[in-house]
Every structure is written in structure tokens, then in C-alpha cells.
């Protein structure tokens, strides 16, 4: 599905929320979109693994990692799960690792940065709740569009 976030904003200005420009694209898929599913975690990626092990059905996993720059929440193994289980992408308000490998995968991955340290694994966090960062609230079931120009969120499909 081809789109450009700039065009979506122009055509739907009153229907979209634009995320502050804070993310870097790491995945092999530069543009991606889908229904939102969310996680709220802090320096623990256990729930990220659980989510990506499930059927993605073209959805986008939005991970509110509290903006932590102290460890990675997604690495190449979890990204590969995302590819295998048909997720469109992952947006991490935090860090990823294995960025070179992730860059070769057919998965959209946006994050604040890259960090070599893995996270803890205690299973702590929340699933499918509204999370807010970058000036936008991400609500499960709403839609997200991401490309080289940025990230746009809407309550209903724009395509």
C-alpha cells in the first residue's frame, strides 16, 4: 500500500495527529502503516516478544518504553518474529539494537536510537492501553502511518 505522510496530512489535516519528529528509521521497510496495538514497558522487553510472537495481521506495534536510552527493547530476533508473523512495523519510544540486521528485514522499525545492551526480562508492563509520547496519544485500534517524513495517527483509516 503506497502512501506519503505529507499527502495524508494535506488531504486529512483535521483528522490526523502528527508525532513530533524524534524517530529514526531502522527497518528495511521505509514506509509502513496499520492498526495500532500498544505496549507500555520500561527497560523490559518480555511483552514485546509476546506481542511479536502473535499474529500481526499487518498491524503496527507501538512500544512506549518511557524514552529510555539505557537498553534496547527490540533486536534482530524480535524483529525477525515480527516479519514471520506479518507485522507491518514497530515503533519504539526507546532503543533497538542489531540495527544492521534489522535494516535488511522487510519490517518497518522506528526508534529513538540504538543501544547494544539487552533489556531485562521480568514480564512487567501493560498491553493495549492508550500511551502518549511525541505529543500524540496512540490508541489501540486507531491507525498509524510512518515514512521518511514522519509519523501520523488517525482514528480511522486514511487509505
From Swiss-Prot:
Cofactor dependence: a divalent metal cation
GO MF entries: 4-hydroxy-4-methyl-2-oxoglutarate aldolase activity; metal ion binding; oxaloacetate decarboxylase activity; ribonuclease inhibitor activity
InterPro entries given in the database record: RraA, RraA/RraA-like, RraA/RraA-like_sf
Binding, a divalent metal cation: 98
Keywords assigned by UniProt, alphabetized: Lyase, Metal-binding
Ranges in coiled-coil conformation: none
Swiss-Prot/TrEMBL GO biological process terms: regulation of RNA metabolic process
The record's free-text note on cofactor binding: Divalent metal cation.
Disulfide bond residue pairs: none
Domain of life: Bacteria
Record: residues binding substrate: 75-78, 97
The protein's Enzyme Commission number: 4.1.3.17, 4.1.1.112
Catalytic activity: 4-hydroxy-4-methyl-2-oxoglutarate = 2 pyruvate; oxaloacetate + H(+) = pyruvate + CO2
Enzyme class: lyase
Primary role: Catalyzes the aldol cleavage of 4-hydroxy-4-methyl-2-oxoglutarate (HMG) into 2 molecules of pyruvate. Also contains a secondary oxaloacetate (OAA) decarboxylase activity due to the common pyruvate enolate transition state formed following C-C bond cleavage in the retro-aldol and decarboxylation reactions.
Entry similarity comment: Belongs to the class II aldolase/RraA-like family.
NCBIfam families according to UniProt: NOT-MenG (TIGR01935), PRK09372.1 (NF006875)
Oligomer status and interactors: Homotrimer.
Protein name: Putative 4-hydroxy-4-methyl-2-oxoglutarate aldolase
Organism whose genome encodes this protein: Aromatoleum aromaticum (strain DSM 19018 / LMG 30748 / EbN1)
